[in-house]
Amino acid sequence: LPLYSLLAAISRFSLQTSARNQWFGTVTARDHDPVQQHVAILLADGTTRLKVAITAQSGKRLALEEGKEVLVLLKAPWVNITRDPTDALQADNQLQGVVTHIDRGDEQCEVLMALPDGQTLCATLPHAQAVNLEEGTEVTAYFNADRVIIATLC
């Protein structure tokens, strides 16, 4: 927990969400289109970049500018996972990693994936989509920019 980050401290001790995937990052770019805007986020690992789509009103309300610290939220059902990276090329965001755990239910599976920086990504997939996944498998998680939620202190 970085002591210099008020956002990190508050979210760690008081913010609770149902989003299984939560990462700290910094805004590196934002366009100013009149309706839907695109925001580039550099995660705290210093290498992973995400594309986020938000409304112009959200961008204004959150005062998103370059250098602003944010908390990135992504619900597990919004993440797809594939063994073939070419399947993910149409998505705005792709993250490579290794499957570390699979909890197989009757209809859904929870898949945990280790990212290169050691953080965990969680996806819930229909059982049929997880049938060819096993622990130790190298995979690509992918999702579109409009699935990502940004939280920040204003």
Predicted ranges, named:
Residues D45-T47, P116-G118:
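Glycine-centered tight beta-turn/hairpin loop motif at sheet-sheet or coil-to-beta transitions
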Residues L1-F24, A29, R49, A56-D103, ...:
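Glycine/charge-rich catalytic "coupling/switch" loops of P-loop NTPases
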Residues P34-I41, G105-L112:
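Short aromatic-glycine-enriched beta-strand elements
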Residues A44, A53-A56:
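Amphipathic alpha-helical effector-binding/dimerization core
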Residues S18-R20, P34, D45:
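Short, surface-exposed loop/turn motifs at beta-strand boundaries within globular domains
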Residues C122-T124:
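Canonical phosphoinositide-binding patch of PH/PH-like domains
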